[in-house]
Amino acid sequence: MEFGIYPNIKKQKIYQYLPKLIKILENQQVKYFVANEAKSKLEEKNIYINPALYKTTEWMGTHLKHILSVGGDGSYLEAAKIFSGYEVFLTGIHLGELGFLNSIKENDTESKIRQLIKQDYVLEERLFLEATILDGENHATKLPVVLNDVVIGKNQIGKMVRLSLWINDNFAQQYPCDGLIISTPTGSTGYAFSCGGPILHSAAQEMIVVPICPHTLAKFSSVLSEGDIVKITLSDREEILHISMDGNGSYDLKKGETLVVQGIRKNIRFVRFKDQDFWEILSDKLVKKI
């Protein structure tokens, strides 16, 4: 068995943990490869790995079946995006804070690696979001595919906007609000949840639309089927708004343009261990820790 390691080199904890992970893999006689972009930073910290074991993410996605994302939830989302087009199994190792998405805790690494080797796990297919900006002449600009959410609003705190929501070309509602979140089931436990949205099981195939601080009695969120197409347009008073994809990057949506979001399926699969129940994890992370 062979593993690809995608480490978050921005986390200081990675430099104490990665040598331990490598030793565990070597003790289990498992071959491993490390993402190329980590090489220089690891060597700065005096962590030296055989240069032949550094590979591009493209190589890893093409040649390997198992990818280990090492870091926090953000690292997991980044790995999901990078490897989404490959037929790989993604497992997250938690070195961050909340760690809702990752399946392996630091102290459980050795036992969970054994489970991976024994194929003692289940695979989940998760919904991704694909977003496109259409200008007035229907020229399309595709944005990066995301696993969590697409958020649109102003860059300034406390500035209300008016956004029109269309579902399958049918007008649904105009929201006076701080913004709108279009979320996958995976993202339903994140920003969407904090704004009052419903929680969906991570393996569900629906999308949700959640208004951020809506100034209206119609404060409801919408649960949409996988095949629905969401369109968002600006009111005449808005000149430009900003789009965030999984909390990263910023893309502009200008007057006269339309944001189109729809759910898509990708080749990647997500590892969940059989002794990990979604609702039990939910209670542990979002209820018991409060």
Regions found by a protein language model. Name each.
Residues 170-177, 181-218:
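Gly/Ser/Thr-rich active-site loops/lids in small-molecule metabolic enzymes
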Residues 83-100:
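Gly/Ser-rich helix-loop-strand patches that form or flank binding pockets
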Residues 14-15, 74-79, 189-194:
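Short glycine/serine/threonine-rich phosphate/pyrophosphate-binding segments
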Residues 152, 168-171, 218-290:
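ATP/nucleoside-binding phosphotransfer catalytic cores, i.e., glycine-rich phosphate-binding loops
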Residues 5, 69, 182:
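Redox-cofactor binding/interface segments in oxidoreductases and associated redox assembly factors
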Residues 97-178:
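Catalytic core of DAGKc-family lipid kinases
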Residues 165, 187, 243:
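Short aromatic-centered micro-motifs
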Residues 1-66, 107-122, 133-144:
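ATP/NTP phosphate-donor binding region
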